[in-house]
């Protein structure tokens, strides 16, 4: 039995014939949709009834910025303690006098407050002198000092003055170091004009109170809270956040970057200890460097930025690079 002749075209085509490039689809059929994940060729339009294909998985519009004043877990901090030390030393060498003079002035002020308080307490206290003579005939005296109510009041006021001065110094040094991190020109006076001083005072009181309460709970909770709240004052100075929000932001920042926070804290402690070993004169260098490390760490871990360290210019007579024709 003979087979019927085949029609030209694709045997699988139920309509037969050649569906060339210029032909139209038969009635009842629309243009085939584009393959998944691809759009129409450039310069063409999609047929009616079809919308633009969705973007491939993993793509889409960029996410919006995080709320101001708070870090985000999805943001890479890019923090390195080596970079923090290098950047801080570079910035210190470029602003040495501007950084050292305020630290020296604050140290003199602290010594004056401590000395005045101690002197007044001793002067207002009752002293009793007792003389002793041993069996060998050698005489000696002992002085017993009993604090009076007036001396107690002076000591209390001295502690308040010392606490306020320490917070003022902390805020002033942070203000200057934050301006350095922003690339702004700074002077000695910059470190004596702290920003958001009221927020800083309340934030400091909150930290001291919560640390004291934690210290009553077997000491360790107080130490832990003091560590995780280390950036609270920086948030108050830099972003004008409320005391509670500053503490929350610091806890979140440290909690999401424990390793970097610990390494930075150790680097700051080392800078101060080395300064103490150099007969305390080295603290005029150690304290500013530690403050710069603190600011660098705060900015990087909280999603902020710092102006990169300026490299020294090449020496005079440096050969030029290759010239293009």
Curated annotation (Swiss-Prot):
Residues 24-39, 50-70 have a biased composition (Pro residues). It comes from the Bacteria. GO terms for cellular component: plasma membrane. The keyword Transmembrane applies. Keywords: Cell membrane, Membrane, Transmembrane, Transmembrane helix. It is found in: Cell membrane. The keyword Transmembrane helix applies. Its main location: membrane. The chain crosses the membrane at residues 96-116, 153-173, 205-225, 273-293. Residues 1-75 are annotated as: Disordered. It is a multi-pass membrane protein. This is Uncharacterized protein MT2637. It comes from Mycobacterium tuberculosis (strain CDC 1551 / Oshkosh).
